[in-house]
Swiss-Prot record:
Pfam families: Acetyltransf_1, Acetyltransf_7. The gene is mshD. One of its GO terms (biological process) is mycothiol biosynthetic process. Acetyl-CoA 2 binds at residues 243-245, 250-256. The lineage of its organism: Bacteria, Bacillati, Actinomycetota, Actinomycetes, Kitasatosporales. Its EC number is 2.3.1.189. Residues 15-158, 164-307 form the N-acetyltransferase domain. It catalyses: 1D-myo-inositol 2-(L-cysteinylamino)-2-deoxy-alpha-D-glucopyranoside + acetyl-CoA = mycothiol + CoA + H(+). The keyword Cytoplasm does not apply. Acetyl-CoA 1 binds at residues 90-92. This is Mycothiol acetyltransferase. Disulfide bonds: none annotated. Keywords: Acyltransferase, Repeat, Transferase.
């Protein structure tokens, strides 16, 4: 792995913080907005954006790159996975690109993790791929964004397994039970399975949260699966936010039925398009979604160090 230090730049500094104050958070969010307008996509995930305002979170650090005191770049590092290397996302202000700031942030992340690092490149742009190569990172994971039209929604009415009923989420009442089912359903997927009450509260506080689009499947009064939908109002885009089924309830068509229920809900909201994210190596899920009319829209790439 060749990761020569970036050339020094006059006035450039990288500051590492465990939490951001309100002014720093606003500056970072403004930078992210400018980058999203320029790039056509977010450089930092929803979870990462929630952490910017969320104060101190165990295992999370923020890297602010400034030039003559002005914010020019940002990175977030999460070190909560007991097995995998710390994961990072980074972005440079569109007006500050081409000056080695991305490489400087990458070098700071490598130094902070002892050169044991994973980095997301949302959208997999050529610039992001080049930076990964410069930092000595190798492609590790491919996350696909799939989309399909909801006009018309040419899906049959969902058929639930025998004994299963569906209702909508009740905030407060269902929190603990849903978190337990989410942990069990995503025991193999720490990014989703490790969600806490604080993570759930953060999402419930977001303007997009609507319990009418959060469906719970029950058998004998116990939650056995769910489909949480999300509406991106500005883009008029519906999302299959997360679908989960308890391991013991899998294999009977519940996941497909829940997905269909959510898509019918999004179509009833007069949304023209639905989207979802799925790992490319989850071939079974990719096949199911493709049979439901989804096709690949774009790809997020994760790179990691060899060590």
């Amino acid at each position: 792995m060749t990761t020569d230090a970036p050339l020094p730049a006059p006035g450039r500094e990288v500051h590492t913080l465990d939490a951001l104050d309100s002014a720093q958070a606003e500056s970072v969010l403004a930078l992210l907005s400018e980058a999203a307008r320029s790039d056509g996509r977010q450089a930092v995930s929803e979870q990462g954006r929630l952490r910017i305002r969320g104060g101190h979170r165990d295992g999370v650090r923020h890297f602010l790159l400034t030039v003559d005191g002005a914010l020019a770049g940002y990175a977030q590092l999460e070190d909560t996975d007991p097995v995998e290397a710390p994961a990072a996302e980074l972005v440079v202000h569109p007006d500050r690109r081409g000056h080695g700031h991305g490489r400087a942030l990458g070098a700071a992340l490598l130094a902070a993790t002892g050169k044991r690092l994973r980095v997301w490149a949302h959208g997999g742009s050529s610039a992001a791929r080049h930076l990964a190569q410069v930092l000595g990172l190798s492609l590790f994971r491919e996350l696909r964004q799939l989309r399909r039209s909801l006009v018309p929604l040419d899906l049959a009415e969902p058929v639930l397994p025998e004994g299963v009923t569906v209702r909508t989420f009740e905030p407060g009442r269902d929190d603990a039970a849903w978190l337990a089912v989410n942990r069990a359903a995503f025991a193999h997927h720490p990014e989703q399975g490790s969600l806490t009450q604080q993570d759930l509260d953060d999402r419930k506080a977001e303007p997009w949260f609507d319990p009418k689009g959060f469906f719970l499947a029950e058998r004998d009064g116990e939650i056995v699966g769910f489909h949480w939908t999300k509406v991106h109002a500005e883009e008029r885009l519906g999302e299959v936010y997360v679908v989960g089924v308890l391991p013991e309830a899998q294999g009977g068509g519940l996941g497909k039925a829940l997905t269909s229920i959510g898509l019918h809900h999004l179509a009833a909201e007069a949304l023209p398009t639905a989207m979802l994210y799925v790992d490319a190596d989850n071939t079974a899920a990719v096949t199911v979604y493709e049979r439901m009319g989804f096709t690949t829209h774009e790809v997020d790439l994760m790179y990691r160090t060899e060590s």
